[in-house]
Structure formats: C-alpha cells, structure tokens
C-alpha cells in the first residue's frame, strides 16, 4: 500500500518508470500504476526520479521477458509456455549493470525510498535491483 504519510515533505523518491506509464516493460506497452497515480495526486510535493534498471543496463524495448532462477536471469518465451526457457540466454549481467546504475542515481539524488514494480526480475523487492537498493539502505515498496 502506498501510504501518503510515509513520505517527508518534498522527498525525492525513486520510481520504476513503467509504473509511471513509460513503455519500457519487456513488451513495450505502457502499464501505469493506479496506486502510484493516486499517491502522486495526493502528494504533489514528492519529487520523482524515474528509472528502468533493465533499460539502464542496456536491454532493448521490447525484449524477451526475463525469469529469475537461482540468482540469475534468463530470457523466456512470450507464449503461453513462458515458464519454459526458449533461448535460455543468461542476461544477468545486464540486470546487474542496470541495478548498479539505478543505485548510483538513487544515491546521487538522496532517495531514501523507492517504489518499484512487483514481480519484476529486476525491480521486485527480491529482484536484482530491489536487493541492491535494500542493501544500500533504501526502503522499497513494491506495487503494481
């Protein structure tokens, strides 16, 4: 839940760009978050720093969806059998590079909180970026 009371006046927060409606998700379509939209409407003083770690890491839009498996990220199929690995290409290096760039942006902008995309192999609290930001002392809230 995105509680407006959880943020200080004028606070800078890191936000997954896809939650703001930017078409940077794997399929290239916008997917804005109504919960985030509501928060920003109630708290216009918040300063948003939008990031897409996967794009920052060098992955294109659109791209094959990624799936976390044992600490790594692999490309998967887009069809109904998306859980089966098609190419199996390991794209972990792109995710790690994007996570490092995201952490740098968060630190440079003095962001203490981040609102990230739930279920993303990158942005989920258990994703590569989510874990890296948590280790850096940044509070993560996942939303969809």
Q: At which residue positions do the language-model features occur?
A:
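Phosphate/ribose-phosphate-bearing ligand recognition and processing surfaces
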Residues: 121-126
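Structural motif
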Residues: 12-13, 112-115
């Amino acid at each position: 839940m995105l509680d407006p009371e959880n943020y200080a006046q004028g606070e800078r927060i890191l936000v997954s760009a896809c939650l703001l409606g930017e078409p940077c998700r794997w399929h290239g379509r916008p997917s804005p978050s109504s919960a985030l939209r509501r928060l920003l409407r109630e708290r216009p003083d918040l300063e948003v720093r939008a990031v897409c770690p996967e794009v920052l890491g060098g992955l294109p839009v659109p791209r094959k969806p990624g799936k976390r498996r044992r600490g790594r990220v692999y490309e998967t199929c887009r069809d109904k059998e998306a859980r089966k690995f098609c190419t199996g290409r390991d794209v972990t290096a792109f995710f790690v590079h994007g996570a490092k760039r995201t952490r740098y942006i968060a630190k440079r902008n003095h962001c203490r909180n981040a609102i990230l995309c739930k279920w993303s192999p990158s942005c989920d609290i258990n994703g590569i970026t989510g874990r890296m930001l948590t280790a850096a002392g940044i509070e993560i809230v996942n939303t969809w």
